[in-house]
């Protein structure tokens, strides 16, 4: 990443910035400077940038009123300048005169994806639609008999020789079609839905409203995240993700922290919060592209009053980059370039920022999204009125009875022939491209207690592994699979397969490939492309498909969990419900929204593990047919041992990974400070003197049992040593004696025995989680030797270990 921050103007406040393919426009008070992008590369000097303001390659536009916002269309063909005197529209590279001035003051301005719709805001929102008309220009020759003071009108039919040339040119204008009134004060941010269905607006009245463009009605009004919003902001510039799935709204407050509230499409929930700024936020903007390396993600840039800029990855709760001290004042606007690798920003103290990123920092771009036409929803909403209007016009213009009908009039009144009605036109029709959409709901999901959201069907899906690459291409009629791998000779080979339904998910290991389709079927292939099983039909549409080693695990939309051993062609257990994971969060007065599954995977031993949005991690143990909570946010604040374990290979331990995920989910939800205040209040009360010590011991015991049930050899050994040292330090002799007795077992069993024996009413195994119990007892005796109070107990078991070794 390259950083470039020149100070363009002294004692001038910038208010907005916008970029196109060739130009960058910045506004300062009553002036707009349109600069070539050549001046903004990091190799340019600050002196050259400042000199360019008065150079011949810079266009300077001056206005009588202060400028609050400027925006290029996405293709860079038009520039809109919002002022208190009106909105000025310019054609690109024709800066001498605005081709249209929209009356009325404007504080914010926003273009739709194709530039057919324009929205401006003050206390109300004005919607304009592009209108393209044809203007005919006729140049007439002057004859020598013509009067110099009067030029007679010459028609084409009467004198064709007098016409020099006739040309037609398109004339673009924008018509006001609707004024939306719903906010109580100024609107500080506007953002169009890339799919053309909605318009989002954020106002200083502490609300964010989503408007449906087909009816201009309120689809959703959101107020809770902005109830404690500070009032010192100049702008509230929000942004819509390139796939239309999320809205990034600024200046939300969660537990006293300034956050970016991510609003999800359709449900309009705001469970995701990006925490990282120390001051109120002015603007947030999505990168215009989605990136798929290492997984699908979108990039967000945000700026606040603290003068720093943060770059976020939506797949992670923490910012991927934070750039401090870029400006002494707050940044008021951020804009990505059309390439997606440059970020421009302006601040109130006259600084212009350029952050230039490398492709390796974001990953590979996904395929270009095919957006629908901006005006499709306007046309659909008005089609009925348009038909009625045409019918009335036909009745009024039809010829009266008894009057002759001219040929020209009959041609005008005759409806145009339908192209789609002829057989030849049907053969000429091109197949429609596959558009990303949600899967068709399975009938069983309509009556289920659980409804898990299914991933969108995408035109292309790429699964890259170290042993091969699987490429999925969905079409309207069928789906194509292409797998590339290396054979035993080291040569690259590939195989293909066609499926009759759209593919939702795909995954694989070195043992098999698995793909899940929209009709609730799972196809399993060998690495060479051989179909290992007939299609496996599950209860509903698959939502999660994970695999590891020989095991394949699937969760369907009705909440049922399936797991198979593909090598042995058998199910590990019958389908299990995930209903216990979706518990409701009860409070005194209401029932809050329940958690959702954020991550899901399966271990090498075939144990499925789910990480929830509230930070809890659950594992299903088939021996007891129950879900176990292996990690939760309660331990994060009260335990002294919260954090990852350092392994010998410098790899993160499985339990450490689960606790890190719990940490991220709690911070993402903004609950960390609440738990910290709760624990501090408890520790100050009388009778809670040993609170931290007891919570730490319970945390270690939970780790021990979790690693034992999940067969985690390294985690069990390390946590057992920590647990033994902790109870020895606290002088808990009964716990130490009980632990040593369990690890020693019956003396009649040889030291290296592997068979399970019956001791009283229970069975005793010489191993646990892949570790020999008596070897673990040796490690405990060595690590607790320095505690004098425990030597009387450990010395007895040391003698018993010597006796068992002689057997």
From Swiss-Prot:
Keywords in alphabetical order: Chromatin regulator, Cytoplasm, Nucleus, Phosphoprotein, Repeat, Repressor, Transcription, Transcription regulation, WD repeat
Molecular function, one GO term: ATP-dependent H3-H4 histone complex chaperone activity
SMART domains: WD40 (SM00320)
SS bond list: none
Compositionally biased region (Polar residues): 395-409
Highest taxon above the source species: Eukaryota
Segments of this protein annotated with the region Disordered: 144-164, 388-437
One record GO biological process: regulation of DNA-templated transcription
List of residues that carry Phosphoserine: 406, 421-422
Designated name of the protein: Histone transcription regulator slm9
Protein species of origin: Schizosaccharomyces pombe (strain 972 / ATCC 24843) (Fission yeast)
Lineage: Eukaryota, Fungi, Dikarya, Ascomycota, Taphrinomycotina
